[in-house]
Amino acid sequence: MKKVLFLFLLVISFFRGFLNASSLYERIINKETISVGTEGIYPPFTYHNKEGKLTGYDVEVARELAKELGVKIKFHETSWDIMLTGLKSGRFDMVANQVSLTTKKRQAAFDKSLPYSYSGTIMLVRKDENRIKDIKDIKGLRAANTLSSTYGEIAFKYDAQIVSVDSMAQALLLVAQKRADLTLNSSLAILNYLNTHKNSPFKIAWESKEKDGGASFVINKHQEKALELINQAVQRLINKGVLKRLGEQFFGKDVSQP
């Protein structure tokens, strides 16, 4: 009897907590704290500086968004492969990590804000690699990419063998060690890497002619009122020149326009 009563009270407690949990919209309206998922190992978008502080273009845009909304912000660092799962489970309210929502499955589960940056795709290979002149040439070759990323999807589309990695840094290491033949990533990330590593063993083998659909803040579906407030805040950041300033800080140019 005591066991049954305990289980009953446990269930009641769970549902009471569930019902009392505020929505993202309510937290914004009440000027509370919003939580943001990000990698923390993907420069120049999300990384730790020499002082150990979490920073990067996406991180600083998220901080400016919080200021614009009048809320506090808390970051949760997690690997890309489980980031959207963490969002779906409610571990955090949104994701700021160069997300474009390119697949129908993701589009069915999540919504994205107005874009805050645009980028193309670059393929990086070793300087002694001469087999690749076009994206179609990667068929059968080893692509070091995160399985669930946009770039992993591109490599899979063109029949490359995916060598699973957790980060761009790991991908570059595998290519340098000849354990992979290539890696695909954001043109902004690749150009930043090459600019800060003048003597790297890599070269650009291919670059997309078009930019992506834009990176955005991503939230769970069915939060239209919260999304509207976020979109309004992003638009104000654009209008005030905040995104332009951050783009110039991290990339030397405005990346908020297609």
What are these regions (language model features)?
Residues 75-85, 130, 148, 163-177, ...:
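Short helix-initiation/N-cap motifs at beta->coil->alpha
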Residues 40, 117-124, 187, 191-235, ...:
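Periplasmic-binding protein-like
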Residues 60-68, 136, 142, 147-150, ...:
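Extended ligand-binding regions for polar small-molecule ligands
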Residues 85, 99-107, 154-157, 172, ...:
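A ligand-binding cleft/hinge motif common to bilobed small-molecule-binding domains
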Residues 34-35, 71-72, 88-97, 177-185, ...:
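Alpha-to-beta junction loops
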Residues 32-55:
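Short glycine-rich His-centered loop
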Residues 22-23, 150-163, 201-206, 232-258:
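Ligand-binding clefts/hinges and TM-proximal coupling segments of bilobed small-molecule sensing domains
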Residues 59, 63, 67, 72-137, ...:
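Acidic, polar ligand-binding/catalytic clefts
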